[in-house]
Each structure stands twice: as structure tokens, then as C-alpha cells.
């Protein structure tokens, strides 16, 4: 494993406070993951996921429901949040670990981000990217992703 890849994975783990494969993340008292999931690929790397507004939002939960990453390329999701008619506010970057396992990721929200999460019609914007900027995404990678705002 290259030093840059190890550093990228370590940074992601610190930002997330850890992540756990198989959807066994930290339990929350929040609403369920959005009933709408999206598929991300190298050909269609970005998507918007409508989520329910949550008062006193503390985090954004991203569920990687399924993942096909046979090449085991290091990948990340660039995540932002916006409300109807608003500008996207970056939330953070996270990725699955191991890189070919479904995962539950949790990104903390600042008070300014939480205000955006109150709506109207908030949505999470996700972008699939290579963990190493100089390496293009493998065209065979496919992720199915859902999201929820948590209190």
C-alpha cells in the first residue's frame, strides 16, 4: 500500500471517527435512511438524494448499500448538502473501508450545515471520485448509496 493511500485512508477514518463495514455503524435515534437510493458509476459519478429535514441535525449518514469494486481501487465520496434553491455547502469526504464492502459512513454537521438541513426540501449531493486524484476512476466501479440527516 502506498504511503499516500495509507495517509488518505487514515485521514478518512479520523474525519469519520471510524466507519464500519456491513452497515454496523454507530446506532442513531434519527430517521431511517432515505427510501431513495442512487447508483454512482464512473460514467455517472454524481447524484442528488432528497432527505427529510431534521431539527437539531448533528450528522449526515451515508449508507453504501452495495458496491462493486473488484479492482479494489481507493474511492471516496465528496458530500455536500443544499436546500431547495440554495447553494451546495460542502460537508466532507468519506469512503468505504475495506474499499469493496458496503459501509455506513457518518459525517458531522456544523451549525451552518445543520441550518441548511432544515429545508425546504434538503438534498444530499454525492460525488464518486478516486481517492488518488491522479488516478482515474475504474469504469467498472458501481455503488448504490442512500442518505439521511440525523439528530
Give a label for each model feature:
Residues 1-8:
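Bacterial N-terminal signal peptides that target proteins for export
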Residues 15-18:
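C-terminal motif of bacterial Sec signal peptides marking the signal peptidase cleavage site
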Residues 20-22:
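Bacterial signal peptide processing site
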Residues 28-38, 87-102:
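Solvent-exposed serine/threonine-rich low-complexity stretches and specific carbohydrate-binding patches
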Residues 39-63:
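Contiguous beta-strand segments within globular domains
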Residues 59-62, 67, 129-151:
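Exposed low-complexity, polar/acidic, P/S/T/G-rich flexible segments that act as propeptides
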Residues 70-78:
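Short coil-to-beta strand junction motifs in C2/discoidin
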Residues 98-123, 131-137:
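Short, surface-exposed tryptophan/glycine-enriched loops
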Amino acid at each position: 500500500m502506498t504511503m499516500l493511500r495509507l495517509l488518505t485512508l487514515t485521514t478518512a477514518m479520523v474525519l469519520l471517527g471510524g466507519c464500519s463495514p456491513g452497515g454496523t455503524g454507530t446506532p442513531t435515534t434519527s430517521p431511517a435512511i432515505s427510501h431513495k437510493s442512487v447508483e454512482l458509476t464512473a460514467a455517472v459519478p454524481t447524484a442528488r438524494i432528497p432527505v427529510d429535514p431534521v431539527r437539531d441535525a448533528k450528522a449526515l449518514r451515508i449508507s453504501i448499500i452495495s458496491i462493486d469494486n473488484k479492482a479494489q481501487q481507493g474511492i471516496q465520496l465528496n458530500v455536500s448538502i443544499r436546500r431547495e434553491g440554495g447553494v451546495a455547502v460542502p460537508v466532507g469526504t468519506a469512503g468505504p473501508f475495506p474499499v469493496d464492502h458496503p459501509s455506513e459512513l457518518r459525517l458531522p454537521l456544523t451549525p451552518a450545515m445543520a441550518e441548511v438541513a432544515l429545508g425546504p426540501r434538503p438534498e444530499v449531493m454525492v460525488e464518486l471520485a478516486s481517492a488518488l486524484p491522479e488516478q482515474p476512476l475504474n469504469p467498472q466501479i458501481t455503488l448504490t448509496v442512500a442518505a439521511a440527516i440525523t439528530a
